[in-house]
Amino acid sequence: MGRAFEFRKARKMKRWSAMSKAFTRIGKDIVMAVKEGGPDPGSNARLRAVIQNAKAVNMPKDNVERAIKRASDKSQGDYKEVIFEGYAPHGIAILVETATDNNTRTVANVRSYFNKCDGSLGTSGSVVFMFDHTCNFRINAEGLDPEEIELEFIDYGAEEVFSDDDGILIYAPFESFGAIQAALEEKNIEILSSGFERIPQVTKTLSPEEATDVEKLLEKLEEDDDVQSVYHTMEES
């Protein structure tokens, strides 16, 4: 198994366990998708993907429909996607993806978390190169062979395919998302969820005490409502 498999296994139980946080995150994704491509999932591939993700975390259908309706209102502000890069204690690189309607607030908050936890907020480009930007799809495994899926989807950019109790996972470079989504839909393969992740190219092992220092920063970042995802180069235990 490759890095994507190990990365997914280590993170599976650690991040985004709070359902309310997941709903907030998906609500913002819906707003951004509707603002970009309109409220019709049939003609908006990004919105289709977000709705699938909402189903995957059991977000009520009413919540999804309200979010789409709200996003369609011209008075509804848009969210801007902003990436922050920096270092936690002990040389651990941190990459933070946010979706904000108030960049001044978000910058101030993120900077304060780094400062309070003895980290340092860096400049654009300072750590992003340490992560591979990937896309992923979880599909219904019923009647499918992971090895055949891997062979079939190599032509669309798939790099890793593996299965677990929840289905078959396909990992590919970020730019392959559209081609794989279109191919899965064309072949009538059920997409359970999809998304993007940044996988560290190299990780660093810390002592339990050092890891605790880093976790303090990760927790502060992940609790912020503007934060969508947090990635780091600490080896997950």
Feature annotation, model-predicted:
Residues 123-133, 164-166:
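Short, surface-exposed recognition loops or helix-turn segments adjacent to catalytic cores
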